[in-house]
């Protein structure tokens, strides 16, 4: 084959034209692959087998997730498990365009990224940088999983704000992935908290948690390490679980109503919601 498959494929994104983008978080996964929807190879972005370099413009560092900004024809890489940055490339060519680190800083792979709950977070991403999602109104939401935080930027990397969720989580962190609600304003953010085994529904304007659902377990509606999250055009939610979870769950959209129970365990039966 004219390409090297990731040692551990991680992150998949479908472009508007149907192309499939795949990252990897295994050893040597310093590249991203692009295929047609039928599996025909298109290109490799980056070079496989390279070491960490969060300032490189030629390779990446175990990309966790890919998100495509249709209007700008750009792909955002959450880069990643090895590098500590957001990287942006051209969708049509894969050409490198720009990058930035935490708070919009230039990444520094030698910096101290110690995280102590209740203290200011590190000035560099602690990592893994696990999501980088552009919104409809020109912002980019970045999951710094190991520091329990979401940082918000403009698309040019200008820092806007930071919010910490479940700051005493430690271990593998609380901010694993986000998805937006599908209304034009993207009023809500859905946050997958893989360490605490739940999903948080967040008001995007205030960034406050409105409601959570889920708890640890293997039954329907419970989670073992919810790793990734997505929404469809009907606002249904899809979650994937890693480790022993190893499954996909679908949650049907029930509309918007007042919150009566802020922290709900399994979201069933529906007549109790």
Label the model's feature ranges:
Residues 1-273:
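Eukaryotic scaffold repeat domains enriched in small/polar residues
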